């Protein structure tokens, strides 16, 4: 049954402060990363690092996601808008985050953290990779709740009508409700591409990466699998997702910026998986409790 999107993007209000679902999804993403990371730390999957060290790593990662995601969006998708008004960079509440920018931010943050703790960069990335997909899934759910980044038109029975899409933007909510009830808006149903990405980049990637990383793997393998899966899934979903308005299609009347940015991930993923065939395997080492270490 075709669904009319009517979710209030504001979860609740605390006096004059409005708490948006999108912000709550970010909190859920960081909490899931903390919970999963804690489990891996306690099982010794990043030797030499305890919970204090992991908390430090998570802080670095959070900064990388937020700063990289916002800057990346401005550079990749809204550069002209940014040049016209550079202060828009700080208006994060207006939306606009890029996964590829966030990934670059996380890579830089993890490199700095790994250097600080004298660890191999890819040992850190292999540890971090399984913590990311659930956060990606929560982010895509936030996109769906906010009624943004919708897909192309579809006749599928699970299509979604987005009231803020261009074809309905000039209609009043009451008009939209009445026309939807009469079945007059079915031709405006779109692919819920946000939910496709939540399923593929969130659920499927998490199950595959978490299961794969349960056993000690060769260096580069987990990171390579992450890059390969994300690049492939994102490239596929872009075929049913409307390209960002300021850019549109870049070539062939179908190639999008998201696909161009995903192709290097596929290539990097394949290279890392090939490198892992001759790389050492990082064996788990359980962290030493602080009290025991002090007694020594």
Curated annotation (Swiss-Prot):
Keywords, ordered alphabetically: Cell inner membrane, Cell membrane, Membrane, Transferase, Transmembrane, Transmembrane helix
EC number: 2.5.1.145
Segments traversing the membrane: 10-30, 57-77, 92-112, 119-139, 194-214, 220-240, 254-274
Protein localization: Cell inner membrane
InterPro entries per UniProt: Lgt
Family named by the database record: Belongs to the Lgt family.
Main location: membrane
Membrane topology recorded in Swiss-Prot or TrEMBL: Multi-pass membrane protein
Chain positions recorded as a 1,2-diacyl-sn-glycero-3-phospho-(1'-sn-glycerol) binding sites: 140
Enzyme class label: transferase
This protein's name: Phosphatidylglycerol--prolipoprotein diacylglyceryl transferase
GO molecular function: phosphatidylglycerol-prolipoprotein diacylglyceryl transferase activity
């Amino acid at each position: 049954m075709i669904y009319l999107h009517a979710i209030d993007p504001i979860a609740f209000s605390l006096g004059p402060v409005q708490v948006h679902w999108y912000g709550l999804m970010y909190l859920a993403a960081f909490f899931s990363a903390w919970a999963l990371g804690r489990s891996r730390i306690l099982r010794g999957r990043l030797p030499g690092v305890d919970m204090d060290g992991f908390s430090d790593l998570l802080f670095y990662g959070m900064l990388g996601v937020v700063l990289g995601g916002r800057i990346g969006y401005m550079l990749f998708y809204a550069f002209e808008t940014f040049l016209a008004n550079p202060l828009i960079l700080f208006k994060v509440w207006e939306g606009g985050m890029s996964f590829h920018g966030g990934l670059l931010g996380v890579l830089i943050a993890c490199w700095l953290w790994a250097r600080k703790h004298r660890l191999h960069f890819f040992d850190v990335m292999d540890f971090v990779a399984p913590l990311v997909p659930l956060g990606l899934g929560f982010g895509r759910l936030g996109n769906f709740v906010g009624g943004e980044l919708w897909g192309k038109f579809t006749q599928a029975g699970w299509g979604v009508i987005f009231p803020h899409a261009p074809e309905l933007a000039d209609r009043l909510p009451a008009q939209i409700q009445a026309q939807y009830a009469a079945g007059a808006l079915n031709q405006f149903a779109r692919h819920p591409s946000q939910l496709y990405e939540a399923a593929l980049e969130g659920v499927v990637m998490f199950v595959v990466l978490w299961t794969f990383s349960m056993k000690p793997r060769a260096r580069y393998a987990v990171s390579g699998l992450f890059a390969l899966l994300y690049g492939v899934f994102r490239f596929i979903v872009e075929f049913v997702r409307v390209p960002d308005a300021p850019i549109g299609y870049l070539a062939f009347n179908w190639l999008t910026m998201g696909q161009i940015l995903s192709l290097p991930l596929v290539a990097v993923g394949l290279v890392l998986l090939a490198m892992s065939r001759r790389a050492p395997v990082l064996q788990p080492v359980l962290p030493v409790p602080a009290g025991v270490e002090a007694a020594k």
